[in-house]
Amino acid sequence: MQQIVIGTAGHIDHGKTALVKALTGTNTDQLAQEKARGMTIDLGFAYLNEQITIIDVPGHEKFIRNMAAGAANVHIGMLVVAADDGIMPQTKEHLQILDSFSIQGGLVVLTKVDIVNDEEWIDLVELELQALIKNTVLNGAPIIRVNNLTGDGIEAVKKHLLHTAKEVKIQIRSNEFRMHVDRVFSKKGFGTVVTGTVDSGELHVGDKLELLPNKVDAKVRGIQTHGGNVDSVGVGDRAALNLANVERTEVYRGTVLSNPGIIAVTKKVIAHIIMYPDTDWTIKNNQRIRLHIGTAEIMGKVSMATPKLKKGENGSVIIGLEISLSVACLLYTSPSPRDLSTSRMPSSA
């Protein structure tokens, strides 16, 4: 049974969490700090049905690393834009991240239309959105207006998501199990629990795992998906794994779980960097940059044949990592928390 992951995207306070709640009945802002501040800080999860998970990501620029972590395994993108604000900085940045991951479909949701009395303004925002998504992975995607007060448009959003989910084709890249950890917590009576989306292979209760890059051995004590206990999980599944023989301090976001002995760790990667045309910075030779690799965040230094890469340019580089890491995914580079370019690289597994 194929599992599909939908990821929200969009600027802070544009209604992503409220939209997810309207679709699923779940408030994904679970942290006390999130509820107090009225904003999403970390990843939140809700279920549209037994096969579809929605990941609610933070919209604030300070938490862009969490958005990148959440988007790492998304199949369908849902770009959320408030009608009163229109296109904002993180609208563009989140769209670039979705575009980089080559998601298989999606839509744009225009929220808060109930607080805008000017129909011409809403039409203008919609035209600007059509121009924004042109030549991206969301090119031609529907733009659905949602009234936050009456709920008008919610059923149309749900219908489109369900239809798109049926068209998703999950690529089987390897028969070996691999999963990037995006959350870790301890539960009384259970011990250490990690969550993530299965990248490849299958996992069963009782299987042995290796935690990288620290090379910690673990055994799967229990598995949950969509809130229920299961015996196994496969590609695309959102999974919570109860790990035996693992201390809470030995695993963290960015850890890669795999079958023992199949993935190496490295401190050097070869990548192809694409600088977006609207970025306002350059990457220079020997520059120290921030990388978002899978669900990990790490610093590294760029080595390349040319003095620099400017906006609109692309090129192959070698990136020296400051700590060893298991690399088998897309990575993101940024000289600051708010600026991202994409770097595509081959899998090492």
Q: What spans do the regions from the language model cover?
A:
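Conserved G1/Walker A P-loop phosphate-binding module
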Residues: 1-33, 44-48
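Switch I (G2) and immediately adjacent beta-strands of P-loop GTPase domains
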Residues: 30-76
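Conserved nucleotide-binding/hydrolysis micro-motifs of P-loop NTPases
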Residues: 60-61, 84-87, 112-116, 148-152, ...
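Conserved Switch II/interswitch segment of TRAFAC-class P-loop GTPases
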Residues: 73-92, 104-107, 113-121
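GTPase G-domain guanine-specificity segment
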Residues: 113-137
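Conserved catalytic-core segments of large NTP-driven translation/proteostasis enzymes
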Residues: 131-277
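Basic, glycine-rich polyanion-binding accessory segments appended to enzymes
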Residues: 258-328
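Conserved small/polar residues in nucleotide/adenosyl-binding loops
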Residues: 332-339
